[in-house]
């Protein structure tokens, strides 16, 4: 569902920020 995709995207975004803060 759309909500699920949004949730996964949000989770992935936060994960990337924590794991690779140098990327951005």
Swiss-Prot record:
Topology term for the membrane: Multi-pass membrane protein
Self-association state and partner proteins as the record states: One of the alpha chains that assemble within the acetylcholine receptor, a pentamer of two alpha chains, a beta, a delta, and a gamma or epsilon chains.
GO molecular function: extracellular ligand-gated monoatomic ion channel activity
Reaction equations catalysed: K(+)(in) = K(+)(out); Na(+)(in) = Na(+)(out)
Organism: Electrophorus electricus (Electric eel)
Its biological purpose: Upon acetylcholine binding, the AChR responds by an extensive change in conformation that affects all subunits and leads to opening of an ion-conducting channel across the plasma membrane.
Entries under InterPro entries matching the protein: Neur_chan_lig-bd_sf (IPR036734)
Chief site of localization: membrane
Entry keyword set: Cell membrane, Ion channel, Ion transport, Ligand-gated ion channel, Membrane, Postsynaptic cell membrane, Receptor, Synapse, Transmembrane, Transport
Record-given protein name: Acetylcholine receptor subunit alpha
SUPFAM superfamilies linked: Nicotinic receptor ligand binding domain-like
Family (UniProt): Belongs to the ligand-gated ion channel (TC 1.A.9) family. Acetylcholine receptor (TC 1.A.9.1) subfamily. Alpha-1/CHRNA1 sub-subfamily.
Gene name of the encoded protein: chrna1
GO cellular component labels: postsynaptic membrane
Location(s), subcellular: Postsynaptic cell membrane; Cell membrane
